[in-house]
């Protein structure tokens, strides 16, 4: 019953006789010797029939035999795994004559390209860049811009509020107010930045980019504003576009206008809003509207980018799809 040397030798020969070099074959032998009905399991169960004096010595011999067989199994498994690995590596050999993989080079995001184009154009005309906080107060986002509490224009902004006084800015116009508070006319600034509104569809996202212009001087007038925007739009789109100004309404400008360009399909396309700075806005920052006047321009960067590159869904700019972004390198 306890011819352990014979059992060990039989196991060794069975392992050595395996030809297919598969782990499944080794597993079958392991089960034959170590499974619930295996040889060594039966031997261990038979210890209950051995006298108490002999049981420790017999048990030790059985364990020694088990360890020998297990070591043979483990060694054979390692050997076969190494053979399988070498065969797989030989099949996966690298052909050094093949061309290497090209490194993907990064590029500017189309929104960044548009911002740079706008800033570059107006910088040549003496406009400087000013920035402001994205978490804005009710005063700078609305009150100082001639949009008091309960004004119906507030309902159009779909504002993200933190509390009664703080919000995510819905426009970069607050930068204009902060600039006029700290600078004396003449003032020529651009205010690019992120703005936030609770809206999401094919032409709107909760976060988007605006660029606003502000020009304040003693002789600022609407004719000058029209000429400036004509030149800008033709330079930006690199075409001799038809441009029209439609009367509109903004609380912070008077008179106000929407600016359209003629599309290739023969339809007018809205591109930006503008107007003469409202006298109340100038008074709110301590500038005498009887002495100074100014004009302001607001443009959505994503909208300009969509029109320039014929993009139909604004959300494409924020989905990080490399197939889309590669087109703008």
Curated annotation (Swiss-Prot):
Pfam families per UniProt: Phe_tRNA-synt_N, tRNA-synt_2d
Cofactor note: Binds 2 magnesium ions per tetramer.
Any one cellular-component term (Gene Ontology): cytoplasm
UniProt keyword list: Aminoacyl-tRNA synthetase, ATP-binding, Cytoplasm, Ligase, Magnesium, Metal-binding, Nucleotide-binding, Protein biosynthesis
PROSITE patterns: AA_TRNA_LIGASE_II
Major location (coarse): cytoplasm
GO molecular function: ATP binding; magnesium ion binding; phenylalanine-tRNA ligase activity; tRNA binding
Cofactor dependency: Mg(2+)
Listed InterPro entries: aa-tRNA-synth_II, aa-tRNA-synth_II/BPL/LPL, Phe-tRNA-synth_IIc_asu, Phe-tRNA_ligase_II_N, Phe_tRNA_ligase_alpha1_bac, Phenylalanyl-tRNA_Synthase, tRNA-bd_arm
SUPFAM superfamilies from the UniProt entry: Class II aaRS and biotin synthetases (SSF55681), tRNA-binding arm (SSF46589)
Single Gene Ontology BP annotation: phenylalanyl-tRNA aminoacylation
First-tier enzyme category under EC: ligase
NCBIfam families, A to Z: pheS
Family: Belongs to the class-II aminoacyl-tRNA synthetase family. Phe-tRNA synthetase alpha subunit type 1 subfamily.
HAMAP family referenced in this protein's UniProt entry, alphabetically: Phe_tRNA_synth_alpha1
Protein's name according to its UniProt entry: Phenylalanine--tRNA ligase alpha subunit
Organism field: Histophilus somni (strain 2336)
Gene name per UniProt: pheS
């Amino acid at each position: 019953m306890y011819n352990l040397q014979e059992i060990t030798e039989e196991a060794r020969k069975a392992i050595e006789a395996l030809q297919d070099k598969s782990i499944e074959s080794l597993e079958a032998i392991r089960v034959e010797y170590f499974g619930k009905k295996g040889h060594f399991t039966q031997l261990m169960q038979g210890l209950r029939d051995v006298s108490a004096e002999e049981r420790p010595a017999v048990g030790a011999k059985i364990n020694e035999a088990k360890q020998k067989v297990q070591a043979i199994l483990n060694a054979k498994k390692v050997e076969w795994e190494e053979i399988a690995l070498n065969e797989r590596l030989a099949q996966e050999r690298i052909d050094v004559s093949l061309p290497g993989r090209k490194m993907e080079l990064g590029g500017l995001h189309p929104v960044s390209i548009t911002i740079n184009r706008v800033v570059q154009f107006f910088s040549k005309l003496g406009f400087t860049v000013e920035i402001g906080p994205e978490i804005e107060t009710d005063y700078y986002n609305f009150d100082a811009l001639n949009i008091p509490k309960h004004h119906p224009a507030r309902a159009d902004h779909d504002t993200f509020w933190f509390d009664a006084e703080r919000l995510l800015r819905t426009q970069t116009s607050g930068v204009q107010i902060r600039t006029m508070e700290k600078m004396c006319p003449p003032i020529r600034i651009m205010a690019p930045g992120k703005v936030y509104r609770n809206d999401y569809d094919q032409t709107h996202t909760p976060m988007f980019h605006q660029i606003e212009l502000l020009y304040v001087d003693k002789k600022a007038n609407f004719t000058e504003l029209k000429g400036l925007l004509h030149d800008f739009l033709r330079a930006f789109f690199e075409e001799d576009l038809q441009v029209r100004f439609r009367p509109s309404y903004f609380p912070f400008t008077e008179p106000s206008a929407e600016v359209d360009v003629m599309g290739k399909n023969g339809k007018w396309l809205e591109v930006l809003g503008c107007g003469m700075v409202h006298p109340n806005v100038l008074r709110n920052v301590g500038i005498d509207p009887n002495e100074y006047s100014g004009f302001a321009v607001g443009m959505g960067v994503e909208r300009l980018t969509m029109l320039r590159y014929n993009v139909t869904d604004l959300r494409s700019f924020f989905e990080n799809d490399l197939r889309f972004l590669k087109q703008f390198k």
